[in-house]
C-alpha cells in the first residue's frame, strides 16, 4: 500500500516537473519573469516531493540510495533539481537551468518507470502502462498546440492576402491583426516544442523498459524526431534570425504538414505504434 502511494508520489512529481520544464522553456525563450517564477515554484514542489521520497526510502531501508543504478538515478535527479534551484536564485542562468532540468526529468522518469526486483510483475506492468499513457497524452497535447499554431498561421496568410489585394470587408474586420496572429502562432509553438520533447523522452524510456528491441529506425520514431527538429528550427528563425510574418507562417505550415504525414502515414508504417 505504501509502495503504491510512493509510486503515485513519483508520478505526480513527474507531471509537476514537466510543467516546470515547460515554464522554464518559455522563460528561456521570452525572458518572461512570470513564467520563470512559476517554473521556480513548481521546481520547489518537485524538490520537496523528491526529498520526502528520499527520506522515506532511507527510513525504510536504513541506507543511502546509491547501491544500484535505479536508486542512484533518483539521487542524481535530486542533486540536479537542488543545483537548479540554487542557480536560479543566485545567478539566473536560464539556458543552463532549462537543459539541466531536461536531464533531471529524464533521470526521474527512468527511476519511476523502470521495474525493480522489489516490484511484482503486475505492478511493474502497471507502471509501464501508465508511462505509455503519459507519453501519449503529452504528445497529443503538443499536437494540439501545433494544430492551433497552424490555424493562426493560415489566418495570417489569409489576412495578408486580403490586405495585399486591398480587399476590405467583413472578413478583414473579423480576423485579428497580423502581428497578433503571428505572435499567437509563435507562443503555441513555444508550448508545443518542450511538450513534444518530454513526450519523446518518455517514449524512449517506455520502449527501453518494455520492448526487447529499441526501434531507433522505426518510421514513426524517426518522423517524430524530424518534427521536433523542424519546429525547433522554427523557433530558431524567429529568435535568432528574427524572421517573422509570412516567412514564419509558411515555415510553420510546412512543419504542420510534416507532422500530419508523421502521424497518419508514418504511424501506419510503424512496427509498434499501433495506437496511431
UniProtKB/Swiss-Prot annotation:
Molecular function as annotated in GO: heme binding
Membrane topology summary: Multi-pass membrane protein
Subcellular localization(s) per the UniProt record: Cell membrane
Record key words, sorted: Cell membrane, Membrane, Porphyrin biosynthesis, Transmembrane, Transmembrane helix
Organism: Bacillus subtilis (strain 168)
InterPro entries in the record: Cyt_c_assembly, Cyt_c_biogenesis_CcsA/CcmC
Transmembrane segments: 9-29, 40-60, 66-86, 93-113, 132-152, 187-207, 217-237, 247-267
Family in the record: To M.leprae U1620K.
Name under which the protein is recorded: Protein HemX
Pfam families: Cytochrom_C_asm
Role this protein plays: Required for HemL synthesis.
Highest taxon in the source lineage: Bacteria
Amino acid at each position: 500500500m505504501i509502495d503504491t502511494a510512493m509510486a503515485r508520489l513519483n508520478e505526480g512529481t513527474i507531471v509537476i516537473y514537466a510543467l516546470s520544464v515547460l515554464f522554464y522553456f518559455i522563460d528561456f525563450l521570452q525572458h518572461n519573469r512570470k513564467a520563470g517564477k512559476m517554473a521556480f515554484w513548481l521546481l520547489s514542489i518537485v524538490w520537496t516531493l523528491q526529498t520526502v521520497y528520499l527520506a522515506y526510502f532511507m527510513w525504510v531501508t536504513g541506507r543511502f540510495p546509491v547501491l544500484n543504478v535505479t536508486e542512484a538515478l533518483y539521487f542524481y535527479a535530486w542533486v540536479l533539481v537542488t543545483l537548479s534551484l540554487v542557480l536560479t536564485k543566485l545567478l539566473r542562468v536560464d539556458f543552463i537551468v532549462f537543459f539541466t532540468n531536461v536531464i533531471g526529468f529524464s533521470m526521474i522518469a527512468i527511476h519511476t518507470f523502470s521495474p525493480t526486483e522489489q516490484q511484482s510483475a503486475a505492478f511493474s506492468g502497471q507502471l509501464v502502462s501508465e508511462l505509455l499513457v503519459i507519453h501519449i497524452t503529452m504528445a497529443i497535447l503538443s499536437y494540439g498546440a501545433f494544430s492551433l499554431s497552424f490555424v493562426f498561421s493560415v489566418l495570417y496568410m489569409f489576412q495578408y492576402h486580403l490586405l495585399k489585394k486591398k480587399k476590405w470587408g467583413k472578413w478583414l474586420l473579423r480576423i485579428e491583426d497580423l502581428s497578433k496572429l503571428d505572435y499567437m502562432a509563435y507562443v503555441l509553438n513555444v508550448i508545443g516544442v518542450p511538450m513534444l520533447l518530454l513526450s519523446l523522452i518518455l517514449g524512449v524510456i517506455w520502449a527501453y523498459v518494455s520492448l526487447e528491441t529499441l526501434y531507433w529506425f522505426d518510421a514513426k520514431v524517426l518522423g517524430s524526431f524530424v518534427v521536433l527538429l523542424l519546429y525547433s528550427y522554427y523557433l530558431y528563425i524567429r529568435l535568432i534570425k528574427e524572421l517573422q510574418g509570412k516567412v514564419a507562417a509558411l515555415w510553420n505550415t510546412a512543419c504542420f504538414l510534416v507532422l500530419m504525414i508523421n502521424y497518419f502515414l508514418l504511424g501506419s508504417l510503424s512496427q509498434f505504434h499501433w495506437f496511431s
